[in-house]
From Swiss-Prot:
GO molecular function, one term: bis(5'-adenosyl)-pentaphosphatase activity
GO biological process: nucleoside phosphate metabolic process; ribose phosphate metabolic process
Signal peptide residue numbers: none
Protein name stated in the entry: RNA pyrophosphohydrolase
Gene name tied to this protein: rppH
């Protein structure tokens, strides 16, 4: 592990905005965080995997959600950097942050299909919230990502 943040690469990742029929956004509380931080499903891209495949895989791995339709693949990539206190802890110290491709999807199923008690659970609870509130619940170092994503979703909904 390098102590020099600049020398560490960004991890390729995906993020998924899941909207229900009422245009509420799926968020979940991380199991490894004592504070009241919530996030949308997200995760890394495996070697040889394209972004969309990674998005579907991460969504199912974290939430058991399969019944979705793709609304939009957002343009560009959005990156965030880990704060110093998390370097060397998250992702085994291999990355300084994540560069993400975001997708907006519509959940077509019923709430009882959502199960966060997966093989490797990441979340302790989940809920649907208004789009306007997604920036109120996120950890500070991802705030700019969620602001950007919120604007992209607003463009779709308006």
């Amino acid at each position: 592990m390098s102590d020099n943040k600049v020398n560490l690469p960004l991890r390729n990742g995906v993020g998924i905005v899941v909207l229900n029929k009422d245009n509420k956004v799926f968020v979940a509380k991380r199991i490894d965080n004592q504070k009241n931080f919530w996030q949308m499903p997200q995760g890394g891209v495996d070697k040889g995997e394209d972004y969309l495949t990674a998005a579907y895989r991460e969504l199912e791995e974290e939430t058991s959600i399969k019944n979705v339709e793709l609304i939009k693949e957002c343009d560009g990539l959005i990156s965030y950097e880990l704060p110093k206190n998390l370097l060397g802890i998250i992702w085994k110290g291999k990355y300084r942050g994540q560069e993400q491709k975001w997708f907006i999807m519509r959940f077509l199923g019923q709430d009882n299909e959502i199960d966060i008690k997966t093989k490797h659970p990441e979340f302790s609870e989940w809920k649907w919230i208004d789009l306007e509130n997604i920036t109120d619940l996120v950890v500070d170092f991802k705030l700019h990502v969620y602001k950007d994503v919120k604007e992209k979703v607003k463009e779709i909904l308006n």
